[in-house]
Amino acid sequence: MTQHRDTATASELIDGESAPEALVDAERSQRSRAVIAGQGNLALVNTQWITGEVEASQPIWGVPGLWSPLPLGSSGLLLSASASDGIFVDGELVDGAIVVAGMDAVSPSRIRFSETLTGTVIASEEDDYALRVWDADSEGIRDFGAIDAFPYDPAAVVEATFTPNAGTCDVSIAYLKEQGKTQEKTLPGEITFTLGGEEHRLVVYGDGPNWLLIFADATTGDTTYSVGRFLSVAPDATGSLMLDFNLAYLPPCAFSYNFNCPIPPKQNRLAIAVTAGERNVLARNDDLLH
């Protein structure tokens, strides 16, 4: 869900634009490049969880080999393959059984199935593991046209205050692929700000020092992506920060159905329209990609 953020150099500033507007344009250009990378959001073609009995082998759609859970407390999956399968893990051809370390390990394994297909192993909060399959020549990448976004709006940059929890802040969180189920999570705190003439108090996610704001507003499902949008926030030592909704970005599930994104909780559903930031993912013909 976390997106890499680059800063613009002076040479990237565009004639006639303010420095903040040029930085937003540079960020949007970087985003458009990132989502079509070999393991960018548009490249994800499968996420398959491997659960059940330890060493109970399972095939995974689209790639060779058999994949098995490891004992509880071990990071990753057990892969069984022959040399003819052509699977490379950390640069070595697999011929037999090998542990493929997850992204939660100190040194995650690098998996290559072909010139375009690669893999990573991810962990859930319950310590289950899944293989993610990435295709650098996916249909999504081939059909991608642009990330549609609102024009830059200086009024969408507002001062805010972060208030850490005095004790706990338990919030029910639902996920896109698990509707009807919720998880109770203790969140780090709230941010308070004024936008559209109204004061708002929203909860944030993460482990700090950078937090993630997951929100919906009056544009959600109308002129912006139906699930909601994300915004990275980073308060200073006093809890003060600037919220720039021009940098609001689409969650990974807007690009691939194989991501499972959190849905904005009721506390984070704004009645006002936030007409700033990314809107939707477009195909080459300007239709919605999904």
PLM segments and residue spans:
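Actinobacteria-biased recognition of intrinsically disordered, low-complexity terminal regions
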Residues: 1-17, 288-290
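N-terminal cleavable signal peptides for secretion/export
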Residues: 13-64
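Long, compositionally biased interface segments
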Residues: 28-31, 234-290
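Short strand-coil-strand connectors
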Residues: 61-63, 90, 113-115, 194-198, ...
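Phosphate/adenylate-binding glycine loop and adjacent helical scaffold
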Residues: 91-94, 98-129, 142-143
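Surface-exposed beta-loop interaction hotspot
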Residues: 120-185
